[in-house]
Amino acid sequence: MRRTLLTKAMEMMASGLTPSVAELAEAAEVSRATAYRYFPTQSALVAAVVDESLGPILEWKSESGDAVSRVDELLLHAFPRMEEYEVQLRAAILVSLQQGAQARAGKGGGEEPLVRGHRIELLSSAASPLRDKLGEERFQRVLRALSLVYGTEVFLVLKDIWHLDIEEILQTVRWTAQAILRHASTDD
């Protein structure tokens, strides 16, 4: 049943809807109780859709011992997947932004916030050959810098504001990541 609900949610999001759990139940023709059993909140639903959309990215591994190659592999692997599931990822950002605005306005509905964040672990894995060379403080700075060139937000800025296609997006993020890593290796 979870798979059926998740598939329906992905279909709804692909058509531009960000369903509540109740709306998903209605569209999937199951009881609300059933839908809420699998997805107690909209955040849980959206998080499941994001995990499903990004699945192969989250399982990414590299055999290379070189940080520049590893980061490059991650970018080449991840950004086409982001393009493929762009609508679902936009929905996740929308929910996250709405929850943040409501919380800041003191109107949080008590729903657990949508927590996005596989970025740190993926970038940490990709850049891991630098950890011992740089030391923990500099390594963390490199991860923070790389987080500015990796992720859905970066994809959307380059697509929506700069009107780049996927090849141009990849050229831009790869060039920037290489510059960050080059600088990190020479920064004293």
Across the structure, where does each feature detected by a protein language model lie?
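Short amphipathic alpha-helical segment with a characteristic S/N-K-E followed by hydrophobic residues
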Residues: 41-46
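Helical hydrophobic small-molecule/effector-binding pocket
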Residues: 71-104, 110-114
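Amphipathic alpha-helical packing segments from all-alpha helical-bundle domains
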Residues: 84, 100-144, 171-179
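Hydrophobic/aromatic-rich alpha-helical bundle segments in the mid-to-C-terminal region
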Residues: 129-176, 184-188
